[in-house]
Every structure is written in C-alpha cells, then in structure tokens.
Amino acid sequence: SYEGQFNVVVCQNDNEAYGAMDAMDAAGITYGVDGDVTLISFDATHDGLQYTLDGKINCDVECNPIQAEVVAGVIQKMEAGEDYDKTTLVEDSAFVAPGIESEYATTMTDEILAGRAY
C-alpha cells in the first residue's frame, strides 16, 4: 500500500509524469486535484498542460524551449565579435490546475492552452 508512504510525485518531465500516471492508475492510486497524491511535472508541453487543465497534474513548470534560440543568438554575437549581454534570462512559467491557488503560478485555462506557441 502507498498510504503513508508517499503523497507527492515529482517528475522531471511530462513523459515521466505520464508514466507515473499509468503506474498509479494500474495500482488504483488516485492523483491530481481530487486525488490522494499530488503530481508535479516539468516541461509544460501541450499534453502536459492539458492534463493540468483536466486536474490530473497539479502543477506543470515550464522548461522554455525558446531558450535555444536565445542561446544561439548570443553565440552568433560572440562569434561575430559583437557586444552581448553577459547575463541573459529566459522566462519560464509555472501552471497549476483549476482550483489550486498560487501566487507563484498561473491557473491553466482553455484560453492559455490555446494561445501557447508550443
């Protein structure tokens, strides 16, 4: 029995979260907003955010894929001998399922999901 053994699962990416969901489903363990286990993931892929909107993933933290473009731009400036910022920050976001209040994360909605570029 998992009871008393764990109540949070943290996954390093959305695919890992899907595997954890499959394993918990097979074991009859409830998770998400209405479950016994809080499920946290990192990636914020479209599917991961859909599961967040559905209340299966409590929180999904973005690993912004646009950071590669930003880094490539800095490298190009360096190679060209141009000035570049010594520190470049790429903004990430965190999203929570409806019904969860957080000052650090945005509540996932249909509108937010539809407006995502990735």
Model-predicted regions and their roles:
Residues V8, V33, D60-V61, K86-T88:
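Short, hydrophobic secondary-structure boundary micro-motifs
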Residues D54-P65:
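Short beta-strand elements at the ligand-binding edges of bilobed clamshell
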Residues T38, N58-C59, S93:
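Conserved beta-strand segments of alpha/beta enzyme cores
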Residues S1-Q50:
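Hydrophobic alpha-helical
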Residues Q5, T30, I57-N58, Y84:
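A general structural signal for well-ordered secondary-structure junctions
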Residues E3, D54, E91-D92:
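Generic secondary-structure boundary/loop-capping signal
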Residues C63-Y118:
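Hinge/cleft segment of the Venus flytrap/periplasmic-binding protein
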